[in-house]
Swiss-Prot record:
Function description: Plus end-directed microtubule-dependent motor protein that regulates the length of motile cilia by mediating depolymerization of microtubules at ciliary tips.
One GO term of the biological process aspect: plus-end specific microtubule depolymerization
Name of the gene this protein is made from: Kif19
Name of the protein in its database record: Kinesin-like protein KIF19
Major subcellular location class: cytoplasm
Length: 997
């Protein structure tokens, strides 16, 4: 056995780590004096330096130090390990010695750097992990033997931490001058987990005691030694064995008795610690002197004897110095930096520990036996492979056809099995994904029910709070009135008791239920997040299988089966999504029915109040203000026409239709709705669909489908991309006055709104369909025409005017009429509805025949009192004179359109309405009669010219309203459509008026 290896000089690496300042130091008033300037330089400030010493009479002790690497309090354990120790592992495996030790005063973080914590492991754990990882990477070519020993030097006595029962051990020196510990336990293992367990066991045996300077002060020096032996797996007469050793040392900190306040055993321990560290400092001083050949006394301490090779022998050494940045530890920090700076000058001679083993001739026989055993093992392996080949048919090896047959047989046996396995994996992934989606659907339903219950309880509590505040206000008002009637009002107001506001049991129960429901909501939300994550994982798994299967499939039948499997899964996913949407719409429908029910209850209550108050007024002949009487007429007209009842009935029909169908009818793109389609039900569903809602299920990914076997079907994309036009909401409970413009017809609304012309072009009705609708509702038209004829008959004289005067009714004249109204009128603003009326609603039909809720109402029956008619006639005459005078002053230059083509203004005022009929609110329409109007009877109603306000833009649509002629005989008038204007023919002139191009 021969020791050989080339040697080379290696400089000792010194790193500095500055720990964070502690809370105790801050409480003492300490300041930061250690500052890291860059990656290598650290400056130590003098805390006693006088800033007013301009002449520098006192010498400053401020000094900068330069090291190989410096760390401040922001450095992590990983950064320290990567910069100092990681590079030593490769050398240890190759046969070099290495040493890492932490140096510094007590309480500066040496043990934290070497051992660390469970969350931030130190150099010990990180080094052993990387060491065994490097061994595993090269274990195929090399054989390794790893042994570990762990000891501590306590009061200059060596104790085995892995086996404390051995007592105190002694140091010995072998024939080569290497220091050994007699009787130390060395544990050999290749398992990293076992090494970690031994390390944890040794750390628990180490001596630690609290002092005034450090609550977890290490009272001993801990030395962890790891020995690695490496040899080649190839047997030969010459064998190379590399032996490397790694020392990791956690030194105890130097301490002052005045700071630690030690007594008794602690003081004795501190004395031994300082003695060994002093010997280490002397060795460093002696080794750092370059020009002198001083004797280096390693025998002053057992610590220096163990570190003999590490400091001046065969080892790559890293010293990590630790200091405190506090000004109270200035002297200790300066001494540590001084010794660390001197240690930089130490150079070691590093050589590889390589053992060349030459075997004796007598050992050749064992080597030959090992080689013969290896040959026999290889022969047996060859025979086994040949036997399997002969058992498959003893085919002729030279015939290419037999070889091809064998290959096909082999692939045929493996192909179906592999294909079946992949198919089973795909099906299982689909089933799991569907189960997760169904569970998500159930969770969504539960969350919806919890939300409904929570809203109900919150309404109960809110109602009680409102009632309580109302009672308190009423009680205070009564007490105030009572106090005014008494002489000692202040005394009475102070001695009153508050009303008893005990919560009802249902309110207390609601509060308790809300707390439980909130907890249930949180639980459901967590489960939903977990299921969504699981669903994403399953979709990714299924996508990977879909990518893999096409490459494994060879036949068209298998491809077809795979596509059918994917199709079935997609249909199941679509079914689940539709069920989710149906649940959401059922919930919305329940909310809507509840709101309608409450509105009906409120309306019935208001009707009772109005009738009762009206009865009191009639019984006692009370004087009623004019605007209140007009509002009452509006109320009577609503009751007579039954618009609210019709709206309620239509809502019930739509709700019943939605209840009967579990899923909405999705209209494909490009389809035209029939007149018989239930537009109201479609309106409800589409309006709910347009609201932003949370996804009930994770959406199918929109990834690229170029590699998928089965892509999304056209029907699936059609369902996803189709949009159902939204009909207008039915107007319920709104007051319509005389000054309100007429309702737009279906055709005018479609052509007057840019949005409706783009989105609702599919629902235009043909002439035949409109005629059929008008025929079915003939009775309604007859009734409307009769009322209109009576109104025109009473004021027919105003419709015939001199032909020489050319003026028409404009919105300006309407605004002038508004100016003539008396003050005190009720303002009622109502935004226009940009959507369509129902195709068969009575409001729309009455609008098309020239009679609607916005028209003048003739004399009512017995509902109106006779005592207000004289006032109305007087008001009508004054109004007529005012309008006639203003009409002569202004000449209308408006664009001639029919009255039914008017768009609704954005705002209008609810003012007093006279009762004479149409002539009271319209000026005489003079001029040439329109050729599109038929004359029925003696009185003819020419088309009125209407001027649009500047802020009312009818868009680029084509207004083609229904033209209606007055009917004196009470016969239902026939609706005809006027000539259609070209698209975009309406423009604004320079004067701000809409003109025809």
């Amino acid at each position: 056995m021969k020791d050989s290896g080339d040697s080379k000089d290696q400089q000792l690496m010194v790193a500095l780590r500055v720990r964070p300042i502690s809370v105790a130091e801050l409480e003492e008033g300490a300041t930061l004096i250690a500052h890291k300037m860059d990656e290598q330089m650290v400056v130590l400030m003098d805390p006693m330096e006088d800033p007013d010493d301009i002449l520098r009479a006192h010498r400053s002790r401020e000094k900068s130090y330069l090291f190989d690497v410096a760390f401040d309090f922001t450095a992590t354990q990983e950064m320290v390990y990567q910069a100092t120790t990681k590079s030593l592992i490769e050398g240890v495996i190759s046969g070099y010695n290495a040493t890492v030790f932490a140096y510094g005063p007590t309480g500066c973080g040496k043990t934290y750097t070497m051992l660390g914590t469970d969350h931030e492991p130190g150099i010990y754990v990180r080094t052993l992990n990387d060491l065994f990882r490097a061994i595993e990477e090269t274990s195929n070519d090399m054989e390794y033997e790893v042994s570990m020993s762990y000891l501590e030097i306590y009061n200059e006595m060596i104790r085995d931490l892995l086996n404390p029962a051995l007592g105190y051990l002694e140091l010995r020196e072998d024939s080569k001058g290497v220091i050994q510990v007699a009787g130390i336990t060395e544990v050999s293992t290749i398992n990293a987990k076992e090494i970690m367990q031994l390390l944890m066991k040794g750390n628990r045996q180490r001596t630690q005691e609290p002092t005034a300077a450090n609550q977890t002060s290490s009272r001993s020096h801990a030395v962890l030694q790891v020995a690695v032996r490496q040899r080649s797996r190839v047997k030969n007469i010459l064998q190379e064995v590399r032996q490397g050793r790694l020392f990791m040392i956690d030194l105890a900190g130097s301490e002052r008795a005045s700071q630690t306040q030690n007594r008794g055993q602690r003081m004795k321990e501190g004395a031994h610690i300082n003695r060994s560290l002093l010997a280490l400092g002397n060795c460093i001083n002696a080794l750092s002197d370059k020009g002198s050949n001083k004797y280096i006394n390693y025998r002053d301490s057992k610590l220096t004897r163990l570190l003999k090779d590490s400091l001046g022998g065969n080892s790559r050494t890293v010293m990590i110095a630790h200091i405190s940045p506090a000004s109270t530890a200035f002297e200790e920090s300066r001494n540590t930096l001084t010794y660390a700076g001197r240690a930089k000058n130490i150079r070691t001679r590093v050589k590889q520990n390589l053992l060349n083993v030459s075997y004796h001739i007598a050992q050749y026989t064992s080597i030959i036996a090992d080689l013969r055993g290896e040959i026999q093992r290889l022969k047996c392996k060859i025979d086994q492979q040949a036997g399997r080949g002969q058992a498959r048919g003893k085919l002729d090896r030279g015939d290419i056809r037999h070889i091809q047959a064998e290959v096909q047989l082999h692939s045929g046996q493996e192909g179906p099995a592999e294909m079946g396995q992949l198919r089973e994996q795909l099906i299982s992934a689909f089933h799991e994904q569907m189960d997760v989606r169904r569970r998500l659907l159930e969770l969504e339903n539960q969350a919806m029910e919890v939300q409904i219950d929570t809203s109900r309880h919150l309404l109960t509590i809110a109602g009680w709070e409102h009632e309580k505040s109302r009672r308190a206000l009423k009680w205070r008002e009564e007490r105030r009135k009572e106090s005014y009637t008494k002489e000692d009002s202040e005394k009475d107001s102070d001695t009153g008791d508050e009303p008893d506001n005990l919560e009802p049991p249902e309110v207390a129960s609601a509060r308790e239920n809300i707390a439980a429901l909130v907890g249930e909501q949180k639980k459901l939300r967590k489960e939903k997040l977990a299921l969504e994550q699981r669903c994403r994982e399953l979709r990714a798994r299924g996508r990977r299988l879909e990518e893999t299967l096409p490459r494994r499939i060879g036949s068209e039948e298998q491809r077809e089966v795979l596509s059918l499997l994917c199709r079935v899964h997609e249909l199941e996913v679509e079914n689940t999504e539709m069920q989710s949407h149906a649940l959401l719409r059922d919930s919305a429908l329940r909310h809507r029915r509840e709101a309608v029910r409450r509105l009906e209850q409120h309306r019935s209550l208001c009707d009772e109040i109005i009738q009762g108050q009206r009865q009191i007024i009639d019984d006692y002949n009370l004087e009623v203000p004019r605007h209140l009487e007009e509002l009452y007429e509006v109320y009577l007209r609503e009751l007579e026409e039954g618009s609210l009842e019709r709206a309620t009935i239509m809502d019930r029909v739509a709700s019943r239709a939605l209840q009967d169908s579990s899923l909405p009818k999705i209209t494909p793109a490009g389809a035209t709705l029939t007149p018989d389609s239930d537009l109201e039900s479609v309106k409800t569903l589409s309006s709910e669909a347009q609201r932003p809602q949370n996804n009930t299920l994770p959406p199918l990914g929109t990834d690229s489908e170029s590699y998928h076997v089965f892509k999304a079907s056209p029907r699936a994309w059609q369902v996803k991309s189709s949009s159902v036009p939204t009909p207008p909401p039915i107007q319920v409970g709104s007051l319509v006055t005389q000054e309100a413009p007429p309702q737009d017809s279906l055709g005018s609304q479609i052509n007057s709104s840019p949005e409706s012309s783009e989105n609702l072009s599919e629902i235009l009705l043909s002439h035949k369909e409109r005629k059929e609708i008008l025929t079915r509702t003939k009775c309604i038209s007859v009734k409307a025409a009769q009322r209109r004829s009576r109104a025109l008959g009473t004021e027919g004289r105003h419709l015939l005017a001199p032909a020489t005067e050319r003026s028409s009714l404009s919105l300006h004249s309407l605004s002038e009429a508004d100016d003539a109204r008396p003050p005190g009128q009720l303002a009622c603003k109502r935004p226009p509805s940009p959507t369509l009326q129902h195709a068969i609603s009575e409001d729309n039909l009455s609008s098309s025949t020239g009679e609607g809720p916005s028209r003048a109402v003739g004399p009512r029956g017995d509902g109106t009192g006779s005592w207000v008619r004289g006032q109305k006639k007087c008001l009508s005459k004054k109004r007529e004179e005012s309008l006639e005078a203003k009409r002569r002053k202004r000449r209308s230059r408006s664009f001639e359109v029919t009255g039914q083509g008017l768009s609704r203004p954005k705002t209008h005022l609810l003012g007093p309405r006279p009762s004479e009929g149409l002539s009271d609110r319209r000026m005489p329409a003079c001029g040439r009669p329109s050729p599109g109007v038929r004359h029925l009877g003696k009185v003819s109603l020419p088309l009125a010219k209407v001027k649009f306000p500047p802020n009312q833009n009818t868009g680029s649509g084509n207004p083609s309203p229904l033209l209606v002629a007055p009917n004196q005989a009470g016969v239902s008038r026939r609706a005809t459509r006027g000539p259609s204007l070209p698209h975009g023919s309406s423009t604004f002139g320079k004067d701000g008026r809409l003109q025809h191009n």
